[in-house]
C-alpha cells in the first residue's frame, strides 16, 4: 500500500532551502515542476509550486517539495512541505524513507508532521475534517484505524511540542500536550490487537515515558491553581509562602521536563511511529471489517468498565479510585477519537464528570502527601504549617463532596453506557 509522510517546515524563508535539502540527498534525481491550485467555498484556496523528485534506482519512493500558501477563513498560512510517498509493503522503501527523514531532521530547519493532503488540511483548519475522506479509509478494513485515525493524533502531539518548545512551559500548553499524549497512547492501546504485540508494547512504553516527563509540572500546576482559588476567597496573603515555594518548584520541574528537548528530535520519534504503523505486519484481527472490530473492541472495554465498582469497591481507597479513573479516561479518549461509534454528548459529559470527580479525589490524596513533604522540608518557615493546614482543609471539603455524590453519578453514567451499547454495539 502506498503511504505518504509529510514534513511541514516552520519558519522556512525560501523554497530553495527545501529544494537544496532534498537535492543534497538525491543528487541523481530527476526534478519536475508543477503549479497546483484549488479553490473551495467561502473563498478558501491553496496555491503552491511543487517539485517532484524521482530516481530510477528507487521507483518505490518519491519525494516532493511544495511551496506556497493556504487561504483559510481569510488567513494566509504557509505551505513549506517535504512529502515522501513510498510503498509500505517494500522494506527497502520504508528503510529509505526513514533514512531520508532522519537526514532532513538533522538539518537546521525545523519540521512537524502534517497531513499530506492540502484539501484535507483546509478541512481540518475549518473544523469540518472527515477521516472518511482519506484515501486509505476503508470500511471493510480494520487497519483504517492505523492509517487514518492514529496519524491525526500524532500530528496533534507534534504540533503541541512545537508550541511548547517555542513559547515555553505555559500551563495551558503543557496540559494540552499531556492530554494529547495520553489520547494517542489510549488509541494505540485500543488498536493493539491489530499490531505486533511486542513492538506495540514498546511504543506504549515510550509514550508513557514522554507523558510522565510532564507529570511533576502538572502536579505543581494543580497545587498552584488551588492556591489561586484560596487567594480569591480569602485575600492575597492566603497561601503566600506556599505559592512562592510551589512556583520555584514548578520552574525547576518545567526546566527538567524540557531539558535537551528539540523539536526535530520529537518529530523524528513520531515519524518513526508512523512509519512503523504504516509498515507493521498486521495480525489476523486486521482481516475484520472496521465495524466488526470496533464492536468487538468496545464491547470488551464495556465489559471491563461495567464491573469496575465490583472490582474496586472501596471508595476510600484512592489507589483503587485512580485505577477506575485511568480506565474511564482511556475509554473516553477512544470514544472521542473514533467518530464511527457515535458516542452521544450526554455519555461523553457523564464520562468527563466521573473522570473529574475521581481526579479531584486522587489530586487531594497526592496533594496532601506533597504538602506534608514541603512542610517537612522547610521547617523554619513558620507560616507554611498554617498555610498547609488551610490548603488541605480546603481540598478535603471538595473531596468529601465529590465522594458523597460519586455513587449517584456512577448510576447515571451506567444508564447512559447501557443505552449507548444497545444502540451501537
Q: Which residues does each predicted region cover?
A:
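Function-determining surface determinants
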Residues: 1-425
